[in-house]
Amino acid sequence: KAFTEYCKKTLGLPEKNVRFITNATLNNIKHEIKWLQDVIAVYKGEAKAIFYYAGHGIPNEQNKSAYLLPIDGYGSDVTTGYALEDLYKALGSLPSKSVTVFLDACFSGAKRDGDMLASARGVAIKVKQNNPTGNMVVFTAAQGDETAYPYKEKGHGLFTYYLLKKLQETKGDVTLGKLGDYIKTQVERQSIVTNGKLQSPSILPASSIGNGWKEWKLNK
């Protein structure tokens, strides 16, 4: 919800163009992505898309693929999740100026408190990396088999806290390159200080856009 408010008040996005879904079911996720596709299509390449997800992710233990876990999904059954590969395909095909994705989730099977969510073996799983396509860049809260930790005293995940902090400090007028550097540095430091374990956010741009994404801004 906090990111939604920042989109409207800090980035200046029109309220009608911002959708917020809490406790999203699998059908909710699919419906909202369809809405985004429809809206972007009518702007005929003039719009920019921002997708933010905070929640659980789970791994497929057989092929190491990653899934978002909706509220009606089961941590032990990936067929009840939404494949990250499908998300990237849907967003990467948008006919937009840019697509920026923020995922405050990990896909190792671990919960924010360090317990295991899905893995029958009780060990974190390193999922395979999905490569973004189109005009898309993806910011993820953690890499490989890491856990995306909470920042309990701040009421957010570590990743989301520093994302919002930088947007607030700059009033949204910051390049994605500088935003990514800031988030990665601060989350790595704070995760070690607070949890004693490294959480290292990653930034994955589509190969077709080169380094051009580093000059993109969310508010312009």
PLM regions and their residue ranges:
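Cysteine endopeptidase catalytic domains of the caspase/legumain-like
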Residues: 1-220
